[in-house]
Amino acid sequence: MSIRSSSPAQSRTSSLVQRHPLACFFVLTYLAAWCLWAPLVLLRGTLPAAVAFILVLLGGWVPSTVAIVLVAIMHGRRGVRRLLGRLVKWRVGLRWYAVVLILPLLVPLGLGLSILFGGPAPTVDSSIIAVLVGFVFSIFPGSAVGEELGWRGFALPHLQDSRSALAAALILGPIWGSWHFPLFMIGSESRPLILFPAFMLSAIALSVLLTWIYNSTAGSLLLVVLLHATANLPITVLLGPLAIDAVQPYWIFTALLIITAAVVVGFTGPANLSRTQRKQTSEDIRPVPNPVPAT
């Protein structure tokens, strides 16, 4: 007979994670990602493009990596399997796929209104194939999967344990948005620092919409990832080429996003941000206990 034992250090780590899962997640996610992105800020313009790309990519995967590690500590392999299983939860109703495709149209709508009021029009050189490749990349290995196992898969359910879905979304939004700050400090023409205030507000509004999708689909991370990716794509393709001139259309897009989020809150109510499902809590990401055999 063998007895599994853990070292005192492992026991202390497990106890800390069990008692403070959110604090552990946020601290580790910020610390690891910002350490990876620090060279981009400190050595901006001098790093080889390939190195910079890899650092951005690795940092983008930190939230999901941290979530998997914490779930493994808290719930073991079965917990990790349950978390990953939400990435393939696709039977949620066609209307939610339609929502995921329609919401990103706010970006070209915002750009169109900006042009109508005298703003510049972008020169889009991307072919359809390039756009499709960019979309697939933004899902995996891009930031959508790399982020959402953490932000919506781990942090959101824990935030919803003791507060309404709206409150959880409004807390998570600024934390999620601020986490991107170093990427606005690296001097990229497609992500100028002047856009950061609008980006923060759009992150908060998008956090509400992603929470709505997540709760309404009973925790489908697949739909969350798809919305994250489809929202990023038109911003990159349409607003990225404008560089500093993207300020006006980005603010208009942000205003439209806030209005949409407000309509969703009014329609669903703040408690669950869903008319048909309850909010997802940390209980929903724990593995189901094995049935006790009858004696």
Features from the language model and the residues they span:
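Aromatic-anchored segments of alpha-helical transmembrane domains
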Residues: Y30-A38, P104-G112, G142, G173-L183, ...
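C-terminal membrane module of polytopic membrane proteins
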Residues: T217-T295
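Juxtamembrane helix-entry segments on the extracytoplasmic side of multipass membrane proteins
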Residues: P122-F137, G187-M200, W251
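Alpha-helical transmembrane spans of integral membrane proteins, capturing the lipid-embedded, hydrophobic core
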Residues: L22, F26-Y30, W34, L57-S64, ...
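Membrane-helix interface linkers and caps
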Residues: P8-L16, L36-V99, L113-S127, I213-G219, ...
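Membrane-helix interface segments
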Residues: Q18-A23, A49-A50, G79, V92-R95, ...
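Alpha-helical transmembrane segments in multipass membrane proteins, preferentially the mid-helix core
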Residues: I204-S216
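Membrane-interface helix/loop boundary segments of multi-pass membrane proteins
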Residues: G146-G173, N215-S220
